[in-house]
Amino acid sequence: MTTPQEVLKRIQDEKIELIDLKFIDTVGTWQHLTLYQNQIDESSFSDGVPFDGSSIRGWKAINESDMTMVLDPNTAWIDPFMEVPTLSIVCSIKEPRTGEWYNRCPRVIAQKAIDYLVSTGIGDTAFFGPEAEFFIFDSARFAQNANEGYYFLDSVEGAWNSGKEGTADKPNLAYKPRFKEGYFPVSPTDSFQDIRTEMLLTMAKLGVPIEKHHHEVATGGQCELGFRFGKLIEAADWLMIYKYVIKNVAKKYGKTVTFMPKPIFGDNGSGMHCHQSIWKDGKPLFAGDQYAGLSEMGLYYIGGLLKHAPALLAITNPSTNSYKRLVPGYEAPVNLAYSQGNRSASIRIPLSGTNPKAKRLEFRCPDATSNPYLAFAAMLCAGIDGIKNKIHPGEPLDKNIYELSPEELAKVPSTPGSLELALEALENDHAFLTDTGVFTEDFIQNWIDYKLANEVKQMQLRPHPYEFSIYYDV
């Protein structure tokens, strides 16, 4: 634990000039306010720094816009992308009128989830290990106007560039990963080794416990970096650093990164598989003598995730693009089942050896368009509901789900086919979130209304380029 006094001393000792205060909005994007170093003191870590919250997506109206950012001293790190020595600090949000934590602040909701876990007596720590995939592109252009709508992506690794004619200063040297064949090739096919290495080492300098990096399955520059699991809020903080570092290192190399689940048609999308477990008094609770070495509690946790999965996906897969990834044929977990080692199931129990501390489950549906604080909190609530109500997940599905007969497949529940359907499921099933006191009814309704009005309905209003291909000459 780091104290406010230690942070203030560091500012003086390391001659920090600016303090960059970061907080996350409802949708999942970091926002920031930069202060001169003499503008914070010990009270900033308790009373907070005032700001106008009226322009933050999904937050206050303009007539009640005053809010405060409360600095978390445990999150201070030197920003490697600022020219002037700058200390970044992550904040949670308070209501200045009441002094209460703001019920729409995702980081506050995440803390409530931990408090709820402790209050149940089930455990005292929830660990999460997200694996967020992404694409590195050389160019990304898109526009939507009254008379046009398009996107154009390009990558030096794109299989579509295999026949592209080069120039004298930039010849085509081949070695493009083919569709669905991008997993683990060495250079020169993997042209992003050095970029990923810099991303990984930069994260390490910021205190993220790094593990690995590698190319992913899709053509066009799909990659993944790995970091160690952490406590719920800690892991969410690390994931935000992960995205921040990856985007900014890519920019340094003249590249651009997206965490969209399905930017490329006809190839694998990008997910964010979430490993998770509950501990108490320093001991893991998911290891036992049941299926795949799980405890009964671990199975009940799976039961909660599977029961509430359609509603959960409105939070863990919260974009219209999410459901273009969740389709058969691209290693996507479209069927709601669990299995040991079977990556075609939506929940997998990894083969983790004999160490009980490594026993965990992996929920494979989520993607990185989710807000990690909200996603982790919602998954924990669903799992706890399974434990409290002893929701058994049924028999595991150890077959390859993609090879089941139509009759067998009809018996396996599937993920919602669209964001609208997921939001409808959340509308009908959210007591497991609100009865806990973790999420408020106000937050859930605001989330549903925001997503419907600003994303679902907006997509429905606009002509799609493919519609012209199939309907123009009717």
UniProtKB/Swiss-Prot annotation:
EC number of this enzyme: 6.3.1.2
UniProt GO MF annotations: ATP binding; glutamine synthetase activity; metal ion binding
Organism ancestry: Bacteria, Bacillati, Cyanobacteriota, Cyanophyceae, Nostocales
Annotated binding of Mg(2+) 2, by residue: E133, E216, E224
Protein name: Glutamine synthetase
Organism for this UniProt entry: Nostoc sp. (strain PCC 7120 / SAG 25.82 / UTEX 2576)
Cofactor(s), by name: Mg(2+)
Gene Ontology terms: biological process: glutamine biosynthetic process; heterocyst development; nitrogen fixation; nitrogen utilization
Additional remark text: In Anabaena, it is present in ammonia-grown vegetative cells as well as in heterocysts (for nitrogen fixation).
Residue ranges of every copy of the GS beta-grasp domain listed in the record: 14-99
Gene: glnA
Entry similarity comment: Belongs to the glutamine synthetase family.
